[in-house]
Swiss-Prot record:
Molecular function GO labels: ABC-type D-ribose transporter activity; ATP binding; ATP hydrolysis activity
Protein name listed in UniProt: Ribose import ATP-binding protein RbsA
Keyword line: ATP-binding, Cell inner membrane, Cell membrane, Membrane, Nucleotide-binding, Repeat, Sugar transport, Translocase, Transport
Domain ABC transporter: 6-242, 253-496
InterPro entries linked to this entry: AAA+_ATPase, ABC_carbohydrate_import_ATPase, ABC_transporter-like_ATP-bd, ABC_transporter-like_CS, P-loop_NTPase
UniProt keyword Transport present: yes
Organism for this UniProt entry: Cereibacter sphaeroides (strain ATCC 17023 / DSM 158 / JCM 6121 / CCUG 31486 / LMG 2827 / NBRC 12203 / NCIMB 8253 / ATH 2.4.1.) (Rhodobacter sphaeroides)
CDD domains to which the protein is assigned, alphabetical: ABC_Carb_Monos_I, ABC_Carb_Monos_II
Length: 502
């Protein structure tokens, strides 16, 4: 029998004139963790939907655990041992762990449920595979995000899964939870289970995967081993150009200081923080989890109040009692969790873009729909927002396009200061380049940009200067030749405070 758990060969799929897959291959060996990467639109989702039995391919051959299959349905795929762990947590909050594990596969004695047996079996599975003691009567809503992910995986293992497909499984996890999940996946690999790991996080791909299939324009363009191929080389395969071209060059001159922060403090979070951002400048700020960076951002936008210090915008001291006052002061915040706080996913693209600036489109006390539509269409063109029309619900857009909608909202407000919290998180490489280009254009027009990111390569490659926060205080300023990811990491980890100038 072949050593392949999944063998998809020559898979093609078209939707009318659009070719989503063109002679694509995906081969995954048993007992390996196999990465699947590519930009949005590269074909990742389509080939996984074919594997899941959701889409029927136009041509190609599929073999699962040595069995050639002519047609697939979601039910038949599960019977063949292939299970999917989706990015969204599809668990009932009021269910117990045991109920979530055995939903639709309940243990019975004749017509009667066996809740005690299900509880014991769920606890045994979690203990055996993950080394955790998790009571089976715990409610799902009381679990951490990582524990909920474990319950999803346990549900698959209860049905004797031989292949697990995980779609962006770390998107909502903190680093400690990511480390725990990776330990779980490595343990499953040791048990002979094949894992397909889909992620935009290249560092995770490098740390976890044995092999990686890279997709571009609907086909696979190579299978590489992370230990033998660098992240930059993988990204270059994804975007068909050198990774150095990701970050646009800025040639415009910097203007006068727009944002000046002096002696800002908040008990328990940060103290005596001072910096300035000039017109046309992108200032990076980074720090480890718990460093105080998030709380600093909240104070700048009026979500929290500092205990001491001042914020000056264009020479005027401002104190924002709430986010509404910050918006009036022409300060914009694009939050890390865009789906929860950056955009209203059940509203249209148009309504999201204009919600904070409707007064600009008022005529005699009423919103001029024509003026609003004209402005929105302009933003859609300017930002290359991929949407069929302005009335499309934002939830139907990709992550990168949702982020562009969030940025367009503040462009509509004609903001002066942009505070961006992890603006490229869970965004594919192509969309990242588009976001960098947009921010570069904003800077060239005189905006002051505060760019928060935990991706140190991104900070080093995109920003003019960078500040590092360590345990609530600034522990280094870096610019020019010294703006280096290794130096940033050292400062973020508490290395001796230093100040580096260009």
């Amino acid at each position: 029998m072949s050593g392949l758990a999944i063998d998809m060969t020559g898979i093609s799929k078209a939707f009318g004139p659009v070719k989503a897959l063109v002679d694509a291959d995906l081969r995954v060996a048993r007992g390996t963790i196999h990465g699947l990467v590519g930009q949005n639109g590269a074909g990742k989702s389509t080939i996984i939907k074919v594997l899941a039995g959701i889409l029927k391919p136009d041509s190609g051959r599929i073999t699962i655990n040595g069995t050639r299959v002519e047609s697939l349905t979601p039910a038949s795929v599960e019977r063949l041992g292939v299970h999917f762990i989706h990015q969204e947590r599809l668990l009932v909050p009021t269910a117990t762990v045991a109920e979530a594990v055995f939903l639709n596969y309940e243990l019975r004695f004749g017509p009667f449920l066996r809740p005690g047996a299900m509880k014991r079996r769920a606890e045994e599975l979690i203990r055996t595979h993950f080394g955790l003691e998790l009571p089976g009567d715990t409610l799902v809503r009381d679990l951490t995000t990582a524990q909920q992910k474990i319950v999803q995986i346990t549900r698959a293992l209860a049905q004797e899964a031989q292949v697990l497909v995980l779609d962006e499984p770390t998107a909502a996890l903190v680093k400690r939870e990511v480390d725990s999940l990776f330990a779980v996946l490595r343990n499953l690999r040791a048990q002979g289970i094949a894992v397909i790991f889909i992620s935009h996080y290249m560092q995770e791909i490098e740390d976890l995967c044995d092999e990686v299939t890279v997709m571009r324009n609907g086909t696979d363009v190579g299978v590489v081993r992370p230990g033998e191929t660098s992240i930059d080389e993988i990204v270059s395969m994804m975007i068909a150009r050198d990774v150095g071209e990701m970050f646009p060059c800025r040639s415009h001159a910097l203007g006068a200081p727009v944002l000046r922060v002096e002696g800002l403090s908040q008990a328990g979070h940060f103290r005596n923080v001072s910096f300035e951002v000039r017109a046309g400048e992108v200032l990076g700020i980074t720090g480890l989890l718990g460093s105080g960076v998030k709380e600093l951002v909240e104070c700048l936008f009026g979500l929290e109040q500092p205990d001491a210090g001042s914020v000056t915008i264009d020479g005027e001291v401002r104190r924002f009692a709430n986010p509404g006052r910050a918006v009036q002061g022409r300060v914009a915040l694009v939050p890390e969790d865009r789906r929860a706080h950056g955009v209203a996913t059940d509203m249209s693209v148009r309504d999201n873009i204009t919600i904070a600036s409707l007064e600009r489109y008022m005529t005699r006390g009423f919103v001029s729909r024509a003026r609003e539509n004209e402005a929105v269409d302009g933003f859609i063109r300017e930002l290359s927002i991929k949407t069929p029309h302005r009335d499309q619900l934002v939830r139907n857009l990709s992550g990168g396009n949702q982020q562009k909608v969030a940025l367009a909202k503040w462009l509509s407000c004609q903001s002066r200061v942009y505070v961006l919290d992890e603006p490229t998180v869970a965004v594919d490489v192509g969309a990242k380049v588009e976001i960098y280009t947009l921010l570069n254009r904003l800077a060239a027009e005189g905006a002051a940009i505060l760019f928060l990111s935990s991706d140190l390569l991104e900070i080093a490659g995109f920003c003019d200067r960078a500040l590092v926060v360590y345990r609530g205080t600034l522990n280094g300023e870096f610019a020019g030749e010294t703006l280096d990811s290794d130096l940033l990491l050292a400062a973020a980890s508490g290395a001796r405070a230093q100040r580096k100038e260009a």
